Amino acid sequence: MESNYEILKKFYKINHKQLLFLEEKHIENNNFIHMYVYDYTNELENFKKTFNEYFPFYVDNYDSMKYYNLDKNIEEELIKQSKKLWSSPYVDNRDINKWGIFGELFVDFLVRIVYENETMLTYASKKAYNDRNEFKGIDNLACSLNNGELEIIMSEVKFVSTLSTAKAELISDIEDEYDQNGNLTKKGHLNSDVINSYVGGFALKQQESVGKILLEETANKISQLNQKIVAEDNSFIEAMNSLNFRIRFIYFAIFKSSYKDPLNILKYYNEIITSFNKQIVELGLNNYDLDIVFIPTDNSSSNIKKKMVEIYG
């Protein structure tokens, strides 16, 4: 019998994917650049529906999800659970214009539902890292098997007002920053110390919380990785290189824009690619890939966020 987890994954793919990820646009001979467009006539309602109904899948844990009543009206059950979780200790209510959960939920949808990967960190386990570290962690961490080998997907997301802001904030996540004297003032997330600490030192130790939803072969590959790190005293990046596993980096942004074709904003994509190519050298990583994914909206980010939280009162 299918688990509630599997039932919901299929439900979102059938009922929600087309709302915001209807058509993927590319640029010929460039595998890095992606844009999703959709039917803009119901944009606010579609963002609201996706956020409200996906919220339990993103926030709740696997053990709680198995008790959801999905036999009759799945939408009603998800809205009920969404409202309960919104007011629970799981969720800290903050200023909607600053709270990262909006973008984080949609990049999770992209990674798990559209791209069909599996999460490596639950919302609750990720918060444990946030509670004790100045660096708040990578926005989304997932994994899959690619030609039989482990691929770890590390994603950063911005849900902001403009394309320029999205580009600038994504580059800020990528690059180390220095003062006028050449002293390091902020480590970007594409930094070996940051990645070794967050993924190797924290995330891989949390796999008990998500292991029930991983395919056995995927779980075995993660065990190989942990063996290299724990028993053989390799860093995460050294272990990835030794096993020839891949990291896929996804930089995702949602912003208001009249441009609905990636060719019209190619320079913004290219600036992020240039930043990534400059910083990736520091990692010493042998096997990696890059996706830059944009969703342009008609409505402002603030209006979309206000619409999404209407049901919570």
Language-model regions: role of each:
Residues 84-108, 127-130:
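A short, highly charged nucleic-acid-interacting micro-segment common to nuclease
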Residues 111, 140-142, 151-159:
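Conserved catalytic cores of phosphodiester-cleaving nucleases, focusing on short active-site segments
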Residues 119, 145-151:
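Short, solvent-exposed loop/turn segments that connect beta-strands within catalytic domains
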Residues 12-26, 262-313:
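Charge-rich, low-complexity intrinsically disordered segments
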Residues 168-251:
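Acidic, metal/cofactor-coordinating or nucleic-acid-engaging core segments within structured domains
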Residues 2-84:
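A structured, charge-rich N-terminal accessory region that forms the first stable segment of a protein
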Residues 114-133:
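A short acidic/basic microdomain associated with nuclease active sites
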